[in-house]
């Protein structure tokens, strides 16, 4: 049988195109894998920092046996949870019980899509970036409520209801603060918001133009993360462990992971919205402006931008950890009153003032 040369070339070109498609598919996945690896490392660092700072505040010795300076303690804890038995409640709603932790984790991970960690380092630069984050973060309480309801446990159900009520109470002031920032920057893109703060360096940060909004955003973020003094959904003295009471093994570890991922996301958004993101603090000066732009300088600029962003984010982390061991837990009525009667009117007034100033400046 004689094979036509044209047919052979067609087959070869088809195989090459398929190979190129596979290569492009792998290249597209690489940034996501790099981001997931970075998130994992950051969570391990945050857990270690919290334990060390907490030990310092309480004047005791922190973790020191698992690895040098206790750096591997979080990995040891995660490995232990992986090896634990996954116990299911005999009278609970098993499908909802299993889905709840996954919904919480996925909703938090999706928030990283719109966070610009450095210059030209963002997975999705969307024109509605900040509002996409608010919409996605509103899904997490559904997973917590499902976890509490499906456990068939009064403590778990109470914790799930508290989580839903707390999220709704503080989501609205948070949204008003983000709206004010969006009006000031004339954009809802996270990248545009960072670039709008770059002209005057340290003095161009939204922190100085929105001090009231910054404080409201800070308090609301802590409440959304369910950190002390806002950890009512899992108050140990009242609800054993809240919606986590019936969970064990890897599913309990997922809730543990969600709390630190929430803290990391909130820290990064405080940095992006109010602290200038990856920008230097010196106005009108760009270190890389003295060099001819090429790939190496571009990569170096991105790496330094990521370092600056994370350094600013760790400031919020330090504040949240310090607050945890400084302020006592609030009652549920105090928490709701703070959200509805105090933060909501202040954030709404701040939004109206920002809107008025923008209209006057037109």
Curated annotation (Swiss-Prot):
Catalytic function, reaction form? a plastoquinone + NADH + (n+1) H(+)(in) = a plastoquinol + NAD(+) + n H(+)(out); a plastoquinone + NADPH + (n+1) H(+)(in) = a plastoquinol + NADP(+) + n H(+)(out)
Per the record, membrane topology reads: Multi-pass membrane protein
Which molecular function GO terms apply here? oxidoreductase activity, acting on NAD(P)H, quinone or similar compound as acceptor; quinone binding
Write the Enzyme Commission number(s) for this entry: 7.1.1.-
Entry annotated with the keyword Membrane: yes
| Presence of the UniProt keyword Translocase in the record | yes
Any idea where this protein resides? Plastid, Chloroplast thylakoid membrane
Note the superkingdom of the native organism. Answer: Eukaryota
What InterPro entries does its record include? NADH_UbQ_OxRdtase_su1/FPO, NADH_UbQ_OxRdtase_su1_CS
Q: What is this protein for, i.e. what is its function?
A: NDH shuttles electrons from NAD(P)H:plastoquinone, via FMN and iron-sulfur (Fe-S) centers, to quinones in the photosynthetic chain and possibly in a chloroplast respiratory chain. The immediate electron acceptor for the enzyme in this species is believed to be plastoquinone. Couples the redox reaction to proton translocation, and thus conserves the redox energy in a proton gradient.
Assembly information from the UniProt record: NDH is composed of at least 16 different subunits, 5 of which are encoded in the nucleus.
HAMAP family found in the cross-reference section: NDH1_NuoH
* Similarity-based family: Belongs to the complex I subunit 1 family.
According to UniProt, the name of this protein is NAD(P)H-quinone oxidoreductase subunit 1, chloroplastic
Q: What is the lineage of its organism?
A: Eukaryota, Viridiplantae, Streptophyta, Embryophyta, Tracheophyta
Q: Gene name, please?
A: ndhA
